[in-house]
Amino acid sequence: MTMTDPIADMLTRLRNANQAYHDRVTMPYSKIKANIAEVLKAEGYISTWLVEEPEESVVGKRLVVELKYGQNRERSLAGIKRVSKPGLRVYAKSGELPRVLGGLGVAIISTSQGLLTDRQARKRSVGGEVLAFVW
C-alpha cells in the first residue's frame, strides 16, 4: 500500500518518538525528508541525521534521525504540525509568510530555492508552500 502523505508520516514519527523519549527514529528515505531533517538540524531541533543503506532483507534506504534532549531529558522539539496537506495545499507569498509562536518557532517552507525556514525565505523575499510548523 502506498503512503498518501510521506511528510506527515515523518513528522508523526518524530512527534511520537519525541514524546516517548526515544534517542533515534527510523523511517523510509526520500530527498524531501532528508531536506526537512537538515532544516531541523540547522535550527537545533535534532542532533543529527544519516542515511542507512538497505540490507539484503530490507527494501530501500532508511533515514535515521537522532533526537536531541537537554539536561534532565528536556525536549528540544516541543511541537510539530503539518500545515499543507495533499487535500489542501497552503501557499504563502513572501510578504505573507507565517510566524510560529511570534518568532520562537520555525515554519518550513518549500520554495524554488529549496527548503527554507520562514526567516530565510523572508530574507530572500521568496514565498512557497508552507510544509510544517516546528516549535
Swiss-Prot record:
One of the primary rRNA binding proteins, it binds directly to 16S rRNA central domain where it helps coordinate assembly of the platform of the 30S subunit. Keywords: Ribonucleoprotein, Ribosomal protein, RNA-binding, rRNA-binding. Disulfide bonds: none annotated. GO terms for cellular component: ribonucleoprotein complex; ribosome. Part of the 30S ribosomal subunit. Contacts proteins S5 and S12. One of its GO terms (molecular function) is structural constituent of ribosome. It comes from the Bacteria. Signal peptide: none annotated. Belongs to the universal ribosomal protein uS8 family. This is Small ribosomal subunit protein uS8. PROSITE patterns: RIBOSOMAL_S8. The gene is rpsH. Transmembrane segments: none annotated. It comes from Salinispora arenicola (strain CNS-205). Pfam families: Ribosomal_S8. One of its GO terms (biological process) is translation.
